[in-house]
Amino acid sequence: MTRVILVQDVNGLGSVGDVVEVKAGYSRNYLVPKGMAVRWTEGAQKHIGDISAARRAREAAALQEARDIANTLTKEAVTRELRLAANAGEDGRLFGSVTAANIAKVLSSASGHKIDRGKIEIDSPIKTLGEHTVKVKLHPNVKVDINVVVYAE
């Protein structure tokens, strides 16, 4: 058995920074050549520990920023203003659709924060007038539901 330090998450084995014991062949032929792990030494353990500490600090800062943005988005003043104008026929169907990019643009201007369109989760583009609920995934642990009102121009 050989001790290795994981530098990537490996299903069924562990996450980044974990010290695990694996068979020598698995380490030598798979984990180390693919860059998923490094051989365990005291120096490598200290180096990975430093990297992990820096990563945890970055993740904590990203989580706090996501929570701050979520607080801004859930304020009534921001969500009340989230209205999108679109060209529509008399039956209430849009000529075209409202996409995540359109929602991100309006949400960014209403909140004052840069919201990437990849963070907007909609099942399919919105093609009807009315109120629709959209999820905004700011962080894996922070999601916000926003009501989007689409009205005819």
Curated annotation (Swiss-Prot):
SUPFAM superfamilies documented for this protein: L9 N-domain-like (SSF55658), Ribosomal protein L9 C-domain (SSF55653)
Domain of life the protein comes from: Bacteria
InterPro entries xref list: Ribosomal_bL9, Ribosomal_bL9/RNase_H1_N, Ribosomal_bL9_bac/chp, Ribosomal_bL9_C, Ribosomal_bL9_C_sf, Ribosomal_bL9_N, Ribosomal_bL9_N_sf
Pfam families named in the record: Ribosomal_L9_C, Ribosomal_L9_N
PROSITE patterns the UniProt entry points to: RIBOSOMAL_L9
UniProt keywords, alphabetically: Ribonucleoprotein, Ribosomal protein, RNA-binding, rRNA-binding
PANTHER family linked to this entry: 50S RIBOSOMAL PROTEIN L9
UniProt cross-references to HAMAP family, sorted A to Z: Ribosomal_bL9
UniProt family annotation: Belongs to the bacterial ribosomal protein bL9 family.
Function (record text): Binds to the 23S rRNA.
Name listed for the protein in its UniProt record: Large ribosomal subunit protein bL9
Native source species: Tropheryma whipplei (strain TW08/27) (Whipple's bacillus)
Gene this protein is translated from: rplI
